[in-house]
Amino acid sequence: ALVLHQVNLAFLLQGFPEELVWRGWLFRSLGGTRRAGAISVIAFTLLHIISNGGQENWMERILYLAMPFGFAVAAVVVARVSGSTWAAVGVHGGSHMGSLVLLAMRTDEGHPVAWVLGGALWLVVAGVVRLLARYRMLPCSTERAISL
């Protein structure tokens, strides 16, 4: 039951609708450029200031933003490289499924260190995808995606 709940949360309630808005509609309607990506990342990140992720004060609310910021950068890079919003949906859903694994490992996701490290790891993911695409080691949908 927990796994089905997490799949529902990961893909149907968050991954699909959020990516449809942020990397689908907003990013694409602004032209799919770097600037569009930056706007999508900033808007997605700032929305999470009101998230309930265990933050207890304003400093923790700011630190919490590291995770959605890093994730949003990775989602934009994946969407831009692949040319598909579905890739971002997969990354988003995978992120939530990874949370289930962390929960099973009894890892404290509600700690500021976890938020900052998680955000940093997402930035590493974005960098790796970007490098692989740039050096044509990853299939890209368009030549423009190579110029990330």
Feature-to-residue mapping (PLM):
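A glycine-rich, hydrophobic loop/mini-helix early in the fold
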Residues: A1
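Transmembrane helix-loop-helix hairpins at the membrane interface
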Residues: H5-A145
